[in-house]
């Protein structure tokens, strides 16, 4: 890639999804984001893509395609190649935790990585995995800040959080997670707060008490709920990166992360426990990791000046990538 190109004003970029915290954080100033702002994005329809490709310069795919059958993503990639519009692909997940097996996502990645002009990802470990599995070189671009701490809102020392969302294959044993996290919290001199999404019931074997409480998880104030914790457990047995981890870095909450994926690459200051798709949850490991997390002071919220510099650098990389793929197409 040529040195230091900048995104010219008016480069028209389709972002899929149109908007989310990460997409908004990385989009350079001066770029024209092309809608419509709806989900699923109509740009994932090959017919829509073919009909409207003349009005855009770049398609940048982040996520939002996991629901599509394998052959539809292959057809979409073929259509994009025929239009000549360059694809920039950010690989957020190498194993989609929302899917029961890895087969569909692997097929999606194979088609998309074969089509993309430029591949981005969030950690060196993920870039190495992409090179090993798919033969593509990915540019590592850090996940930028997506939250700010609430002024004056303190954390309770020893308070551990665990969120139980809509049941999925990535969390096959929520009761086992609660049991091990509760044991670790108590062994570390603390207590456990379990957050429940709407419609999710607490595991029936655990009643609330002095060491265990249940709270509704509030999407609009989730960063503040995380800020009140000393530590939080990420429960998935599969996945690659976590935006929730970045929120915790921003607000100053320690993360207890599973051994799957590249969470420790994303933020070195995590405590890891054994939980992956092949071997499952090791409850003794989670118990010990939670207790160990409580022996350490909660991390300070990420320095806002450093986070602002990081975001500017991330946007500069995206501007450079967009300018380069547009120039390559014109040449």
Question: Model-derived features: where do they sit?
Answer:
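Short hydrophobic beta-strand element within catalytic cores of glycosyltransferases
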Residues: 254-260, 264
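A charged, aromatic-enriched C-terminal amphipathic alpha-helix characteristic of glycosyltransferases
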Residues: 277-330
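Nucleotide-activated donor-binding/catalytic signature segment of Leloir-type glycosyltransferases, i.e.
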Residues: 198-224, 231
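Acidic donor-binding loop of glycosyltransferase active sites
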Residues: 224-240, 250-253
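Short N-terminal targeting/anchoring amphipathic segment
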Residues: 42, 48-71, 88-90, 235
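Membrane-proximal helix-turn-helix segments that form the acceptor-binding/catalytic region
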Residues: 75-86, 99-118
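Conserved catalytic-core segment of nucleotide-activated headgroup transferases in glycan assembly
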Residues: 155-205
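Donor nucleotide-sugar binding/catalytic pocket of nucleotide-sugar-dependent glycosyltransferases
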Residues: 114-131, 135-150
């Amino acid at each position: 890639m040529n040195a230091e190109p900048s995104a010219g004003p008016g480069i028209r970029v389709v972002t899929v999804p149109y908007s989310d915290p990460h997409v908004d954080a990385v989009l350079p100033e001066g770029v024209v984001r092309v809608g419509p702002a709806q989900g699923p994005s109509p740009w994932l329809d090959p017919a829509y893509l073919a009909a409207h490709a003349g009005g855009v310069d770049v398609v940048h795919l982040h996520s939002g395609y996991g629901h599509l059958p394998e052959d539809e993503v292959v057809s979409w990639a073929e259509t994009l190649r025929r239009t000549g519009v360059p694809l920039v692909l950010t690989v957020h997940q190498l194993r989609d935790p929302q899917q029961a097996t890895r087969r569909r996502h692997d097929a999606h990645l194979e088609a998309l990585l074969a089509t993309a002009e430029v591949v981005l990802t969030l950690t060196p470990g993920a870039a190495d995995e992409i090179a090993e599995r798919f033969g593509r070189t990915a540019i590592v671009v850090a996940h930028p800040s997506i939250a700010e701490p609430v002024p004056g809102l303190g954390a309770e020392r020893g308070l551990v959080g665990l969120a139980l969302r809509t049941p999925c294959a990535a969390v096959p044993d929520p009761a086992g997670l609660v049991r091990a996290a509760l044991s670790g919290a108590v062994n570390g001199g603390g207590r456990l707060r379990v957050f429940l999404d709407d419609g999710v019931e607490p595991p029936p074997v655990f009643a609330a008490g002095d060491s265990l409480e249940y709270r509704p998880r509030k999407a609009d104030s989730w960063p503040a709920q995380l800020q009140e914790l000393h530590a939080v457990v990420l429960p998935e047995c599969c996945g690659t990166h976590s935006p929730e981890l970045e929120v915790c870095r921003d607000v100053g909450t320690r993360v207890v992360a599973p051994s799957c994926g590249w969470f420790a690459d994303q933020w070195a200051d995590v405590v890891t426990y054994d939980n992956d798709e092949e071997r499952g949850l090791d409850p003794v490991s989670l118990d010990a990791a939670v207790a160990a997390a409580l022996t350490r002071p909660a991390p300070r919220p990420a320095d806002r000046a450093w986070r602002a510099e990081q975001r500017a650098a991330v946007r500069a990389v995206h501007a450079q990538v967009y300018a380069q793929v547009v120039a390559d197409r014109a040449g």
